[in-house]
Regions:
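Extracellular receptor-binding modules and their adjoining Ser/Thr/Gly/Asp/Asn-rich linkers
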Residues: 1-87, 91-96, 115-193
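Short conserved beta-strand and strand-loop elements enriched in small hydrophobics
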Residues: 101-108
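Extended, low-complexity, turn-rich repeat/linker tracts enriched in Gly/Pro/Ser/Thr and Asp/Glu
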Residues: 110-112
């Protein structure tokens, strides 16, 4: 499945909010209106509604740095695989689809032939408690593994999409990248522009 890097909308398109991805488009999809106004598709946090007119920023990054570069795959995965599982560690629990439209990053390994630096788009993931629970990432079929991943030797990381569960920004809470001003109210867990 491929998507245009930019879509062009009409006035009023930015006021749409719904429980499934708008137009089946990925989080972060750019939409430009006739006057040049720009909007990106985002998803409200599962427990918090979006307030129209409020300024939003990227949600706080998980403090468990293991998620970014030190996860060990639960098995060996062949070229063409579209799912990769890892065992959670540290204190981070993972919610369902927390990494939707985010990235699986190959952080590296010992030895030659490492696919270090490769990244793959995440379609979905299951929930997993902290400690020693298995989390399975499902990759988009067109972005299947191009290099095999060997269990126990490769380190991986996961990165959430910037438009997944943004949080409201106030003058004293700017902690990350600003994602924009919500043009409408949206229910918790809904997709919106």
């Amino acid at each position: 499945m491929s998507f245009p890097s930019v879509i062009y909308g009409d006035f009023g398109d930015e006021k749409l909010a719904q429980s499934v991805k708008i137009g089946g488009l990925p989080l972060g999809q750019l939409m430009i209106l006739p006057d040049g106004s720009k909007f990106r598709q985002a998803r409200a946090p599962s427990g918090t509604a979006i307030v129209a007119g409020s300024l939003y920023q990227v949600a706080a990054r998980n403090s468990d740095t293991m998620l970014y570069k030190s996860l060990i795959p639960a098995a060996t995965y062949a070229v063409g695989a579209t799912s990769v599982a890892f065992t959670t560690g540290g204190t981070a629990s993972i919610t369902t689809n927390q990494f939707e439209d985010g990235w699986l990053m190959i952080a590296g390994s010992a030895g030659s032939g490492s696919p270090k630096g490769e990244k793959y788009r995440i379609k979905s993931n299951n929930s997993a408690a902290s400690g020693s629970t298995t989390c399975t990432l499902t990759l988009y079929p067109e972005d299947a593994l191009k290099t095999a991943i060997a269990a126990g030797t490769i380190r991986i990381g996961v990165v959430a999409n910037d438009y997944q569960s943004p949080v409201v920004t106030t003058a004293d809470t700017v902690l990350d990248v600003i994602v924009g001003v919500a043009p409408i109210a949206a229910s918790a867990g809904f997709y919106y522009w």
